[in-house]
């Protein structure tokens, strides 16, 4: 189960681009909490704290308990915008989580036993097709990751979605497709080029070639022409 982190926020009273710019000048980032049958609630968050959380990774699958003036709400980030040039946060959206609710999230896949994989030991390579899977999960029990064990895969073997053990209550959003998660590809074999093959065939072989050289060297020189 994913860890729930705490996050302090303040109520935001102005809306629109002008109000958002004013919030950012104060070192804060505008955001909104929505969903769960309650009205949308504009908020502001500390710029440095939010920026750190976004770039720490897995921001969109992290549960937060947001405290707005003493009122705590359980939420999950659903979207955020970054400045296209500076890559700094501009806005963030949070979805309220009600008891018993479910939601769609991208859950990362962790690949185990890559070093001991039989196919890798024989020269194969791990080809990861999907680094994450979209799942519908309980809002109060979001998995941090799904594991894929490569410990028994040979060269040309694959792991598909149905081979993964999903946590209780979690199901893939694309249940009609048993897509590939990872494959073990064979080692790359460099084929001999036609030019190299022709050169090898034309090269002198064994003692016959060695004897031919002295014979050619022993041939008498042509007589000089008389003037």
From Swiss-Prot:
Region feature Disordered, mapped onto this chain: 1-22
Any one of the GO CC terms: cytosolic large ribosomal subunit
Keyword Disulfide bond in annotation: no
UniProt KW rRNA-binding keyword: yes
One Gene Ontology biological process: translation
Listed transmembrane segments: none
GO MF annotation list: 5S rRNA binding; structural constituent of ribosome
Keywords: Ribonucleoprotein, Ribosomal protein, RNA-binding, rRNA-binding
Function: This is one of the proteins that binds to the 5S RNA in the ribosome where it forms part of the central protuberance.
NCBIfam families: bL25_bact_ctc, PRK05618.1-2
Family: Belongs to the bacterial ribosomal protein bL25 family. CTC subfamily.
Protein name: Large ribosomal subunit protein bL25
